[in-house]
């Protein structure tokens, strides 16, 4: 399955909630009707969604939020299930500790897609070493930084400004003047914002 490159707002409308796929410069709710499905007049149906359909939609929503394809998502779930603790929470923690997501959470990219591009274009270092794999798992204590030649990019400066206005997660510490941040610890479930019901995904894969 190829990565989706179409309109980001369409995906949020499909899920009926803002997936934060676009910059926070303007609220997505101001741009489109999130309660209206994609299509000229919005797709309507009187049929009740089945339990399976609800579970599948939740999985699709989380995949789209983090920009992960099906095969990779299955691997994340298998690893989450293998680890001790709550499988659903483990899954979200694995997704949150992806390098592209951490770059986004630190405010170096205004969206996860932009953060993923920064990583792919070798604009990011981890502990002083260039890292260009978006799915790299970041560990507690790792230092993430913007490379010197990328510090003047307008999109990074703008993203940092937006992040400072909106606030940063407690599990990262960022020095915006140095363009670097520290992944202090794995986030707790309560630290992960967003309208996500991970238990539905666990139920889906438990069928």
Swiss-Prot record:
One of its GO terms (molecular function) is rRNA binding. The gene is rpsD. This is Small ribosomal subunit protein uS4. It comes from the Bacteria. Pfam families: Ribosomal_S4, S4. One of the primary rRNA binding proteins, it binds directly to 16S rRNA where it nucleates assembly of the body of the 30S subunit. The keyword DNA-binding does not apply. It comes from Paraburkholderia phymatum (strain DSM 17167 / CIP 108236 / LMG 21445 / STM815) (Burkholderia phymatum). Residues 97-160 form the S4 RNA-binding domain. Residues 42-53 have a biased composition (Polar residues). Keywords: Ribonucleoprotein, Ribosomal protein, RNA-binding, rRNA-binding. Part of the 30S ribosomal subunit. Contacts protein S5. The interaction surface between S4 and S5 is involved in control of translational fidelity. HAMAP family: Ribosomal_uS4_B. PANTHER family: 30S 40S RIBOSOMAL PROTEIN (PTHR11831), SMALL RIBOSOMAL SUBUNIT PROTEIN US4M (PTHR11831:SF4). GO terms for cellular component: small ribosomal subunit. Belongs to the universal ribosomal protein uS4 family. One of its GO terms (biological process) is ribosomal small subunit biogenesis. Residues 31-55 are annotated as: Disordered.
């Amino acid at each position: 399955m190829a990565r989706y490159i179409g309109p980001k707002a369409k995906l949020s409308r499909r899920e009926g909630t803002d997936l934060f796929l676009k910059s926070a410069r303007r609220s997505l709710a101001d741009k489109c009707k999130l309660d209206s499905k994609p299509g000229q007049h919005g797709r309507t149906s009187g049929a009740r969604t089945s339990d399976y359909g609800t579970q599948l939609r939740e999985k699709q929503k989380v995949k789209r939020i983090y920009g992960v394809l099906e095969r990779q998502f299955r691997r994340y779930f298998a690893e989450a299930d293998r680890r001790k603790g709550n499988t659903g929470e483990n899954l979200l923690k694995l997704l949150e500790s992806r390098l592209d997501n951490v770059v986004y959470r630190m405010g170096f990219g205004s969206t996860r897609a932009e953060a993923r591009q920064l990583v792919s274009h070798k604009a990011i270092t981890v502990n002083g070493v260039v890292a260009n794999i978006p799915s790299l798992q970041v560990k507690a204590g790792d230092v993430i930084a913007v490379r010197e030649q990328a510090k003047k990019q307008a999109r990074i400066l703008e993203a940092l400004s937006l992040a400072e206005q909106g606030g940063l997660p407690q599990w990262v510490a960022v020095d915006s003047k140095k363009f670097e941040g520290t992944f202090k610890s794995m986030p707790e479930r309560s630290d992960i914002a967003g309208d996500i019901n991970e238990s539905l995904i666990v139920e889906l894969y438990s069928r």
